[in-house]
């Protein structure tokens, strides 16, 4: 194999590695965003549950629609 051919193979390997790394990173970011949305939903459910109890809503007026 000549030097030019070896260099071409090297470039192809680097390109393939970059493409695989980039696509797997984007998929990972999507999973993180989904987990973050799920956490936000759980937090909002917990806050709504707190607001339905008078003692909790008095202690957390900012979350339950009251003035701070």
From Swiss-Prot:
Keywords from the named record: Acetylcholine receptor inhibiting toxin, Amidation, Disulfide bond, Ion channel impairing toxin, Neurotoxin, Postsynaptic neurotoxin, Secreted, Signal, Toxin
UniProt keyword Kinase present: no
N-terminal signal peptide: 1-21
Tissue expression: Expressed by the venom duct.
GO terms under cellular component: extracellular region; host cell postsynaptic membrane
GO MF, one example: ion channel regulator activity
Compartments in which it is found: Secreted
Keyword hit for Disulfide bond: yes
This protein's name: Alpha-conotoxin-like Lp1.2
InterPro entries (alphabetical): Conotoxin_a-typ
Modified residues (Cysteine amide): 64
Lineage, uppermost ranks: Eukaryota, Metazoa, Spiralia, Lophotrochozoa, Mollusca
Its job: Alpha-conotoxins act on postsynaptic membranes, they bind to the nicotinic acetylcholine receptors (nAChR) and thus inhibit them.
Disulfide-bond pairs as recorded: 50-56, 51-64
Highest taxon in the source lineage: Eukaryota
